[in-house]
């Protein structure tokens, strides 16, 4: 599988690239200053991919600031949704999915380098890629669908989603931590799956690769 990886100038980028390659992906990295014409060409399937019925996967990385200030991130995210390119947005990339669908990203309080136990929603419990990562609640815990331990490094986020996005998990103060698009092959993670503070990260990335390539 080929991944077109948009680097939003974050210190975690190559940890994430290494995680993807460890899952068997060929990863081509582009900075968010790359011209859109180069990126759209990279996202076109090769002849071999066409013959196999495959498309490359777009991953948009974490990064500093607001997604609307991150080079071509917003334009590329909107293009990927329109063209139904399988897309995984992580942290800043997740926020770009929210904004591209008409939602708003706003300050939610700094949570840099913190492990958090996030609650899975009913939709998350029904989302196959999350299933192997969910820890079942113990008796008396207020987590009817289970929870996941994740690494959070962000100060912006979203507590409400536009209609076409579905919350899969949220923090205890209702900041959305994972989403999927209702009709396009796109998933967003506000947390960092590549961090050692997200124990199920490698399992989740493998499951998302399978899901997104099948949905394309």
Model-derived regions: residue spans:
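Cysteine-nucleophile active-site neighborhood
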Residues: 54-127
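Extreme N-terminal starter segment of soluble prokaryotic enzymes
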Residues: 1-4, 56
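Short amphipathic alpha-helix with an adjacent loop that forms part of the alpha/beta core around
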Residues: 36-54
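A short beta-strand-loop structural module common to alpha/beta enzyme folds
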Residues: 26-34
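Catalytic beta-strand/loop cores that center a nucleophilic Ser/Cys/Thr
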Residues: 129-183
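A short, Lys/Arg-enriched amphipathic alpha-helix followed by its capping loop at the start of a domain
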Residues: 19-25
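Acyltransferase
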Residues: 196-216
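Active-site-adjacent helical/loop segments in soluble small-molecule enzymes
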Residues: 13
